[in-house]
Design a protein with these regions (language model features):
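Collagenous Gly-X-Y triple-helix signature in extracellular proteins
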Residues: 39-237
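N-terminal Sec-pathway targeting helices
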Residues: 5-21
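N-terminal intrinsically disordered, acidic low-complexity segments at the extreme N-terminus
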Residues: 1-2
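Sec-dependent signal peptide cleavage junction
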Residues: 25-47
Length: 237
């Protein structure tokens, strides 16, 4: 009888040890390692000068079976404990909106929905998502606050951070070209920027020469323009 009790106690001890080991492994995989990666990412962004590039998130870019590639971002500015990043390359092709469904504003545009859902979930891990800040969207026709995690730069941002036409020129990834982005003889493409909150059926884009222009109406239905993604990231996580 005593021997049976001793065996049961030993089994219980082994079970407790096993549970402790499993708990440590789970915490390491789900908490400690992701937090360490986040801290490392924050340090990289903090240490990288404005105008230089960093890697953050992954997205298909070379159109091969090797899996997604790391996204390169240009650091546009740093404000207190956050940084504004824009993708170095055009990452995909997408239409701004479908005017056949009614008047299109940024708030109800198809490209905003795609960025906020499909792209956001495809490009970022949960730990990376924890660094991305909600950015308020002002909308004169709707008093309710709206927020974006992933967005297009505005005209003021495009012209403010890229002060010359040459600096606005952008090349797409091979994947973006395969999805319809058209390029000129030098490999540059057209890429969208966000329209003003008061305008309907009006989309901004940067052309092959780097000039920032607007077009209206059916033009915004075109899906051969590129998407250059922008995000704000938290540097005090």
């Amino acid at each position: 009888m005593e021997e049976q009790i001793k065996v049961k106690k030993n089994k219980l001890k082994l079970l407790i040890v096993a549970l402790v080991i499993v708990t440590v492994i789970v915490l390491t995989v789900t908490v400690i390692v992701p937090n360490a990666k986040v801290s490392k990412q924050i340090k990289v962004i903090k240490d990288t000068p404005i105008g230089e590039t960093i890697e953050f998130g992954t997205y298909e870019q070379d159109e091969t079976s090797s899996g997604k590639e790391k996204i390169e971002w240009i650091i546009l500015t740093k404000e207190e404990d956050k940084a504004l990043l824009v993708s170095k390359y055009v990452l995909d092709a997408y239409n701004y909106g479908d005017t056949s469904t009614g008047d299109i504003y940024w708030q109800n545009s198809s490209i905003r929905d795609w960025l906020s859902n499909s792209f956001y979930n495809e490009a970022f891990s949960n730990s990376e998502k924890s660094l991305i800040i909600d950015t308020e969207v002002t909308y004169l026709l709707d008093p309710n606050d709206q927020y974006d995690k992933v967005f297009l730069l505005s005209e003021d941002e495009v012209k403010g951070y890229f002060v010359t036409d040459d600096s606005r020129k952008c090349k797409p990834t091979s994947y973006a070209v395969s999805n319809g982005v058209t390029v000129d003889e030098n490999g540059y493409c057209l890429w969208w920027y966000k329209n003003p909150d008061w305008s309907k059926n009006l989309a901004g884009w940067v052309d092959y020469t780097g000039e920032a222009v607007y077009r209206t109406g059916e033009f915004i239905n075109d899906s051969n323009l590129g998407v250059r993604v922008a995000i704000w990231v938290n540097l005090k996580h």
